[in-house]
Amino acid sequence: MIAVVFRYDVRDSETFEEAYGPVGEWAKFFRDGTGFIGTELLRDVEEPDRYIVIDRWESIDAYNVFISEHQKEYLERSDESRLFYLQELRFGTFENVWVD
């Protein structure tokens, strides 16, 4: 399992949560992908306009295939989504090394 992790500083929390949450437009888009597990949305308790988004996939290959096959739509959605945030930082793609 891998996790693709982003941090966002947002303009409007409610709008951002609707778009990026587990039932939001991004998660709906990813659900079409083989190997997509789900999205987790975390809000910073000390800075409530800061969020972490974690998209989980069965493998890096599943993620890369989806992005490759849907690159045009992914880029279009990314451009449209810029209205929701002030800053986006991609932390990286992480794999589980220990599961309890």
State where each predicted segment sits.
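Short, well-ordered beta-strand segments in beta-rich or mixed alpha/beta enzyme
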Residues: 2-9, 38-68
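Residue-level signal for secondary-structure boundary sites
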Residues: 14-16, 61-63, 99
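Glycine-rich beta-strand-turn "strand-cap" elements at beta-sheet edges
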Residues: 2, 38-49, 75-100
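Short amphipathic alpha-helical segments
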Residues: 13-38, 73-79
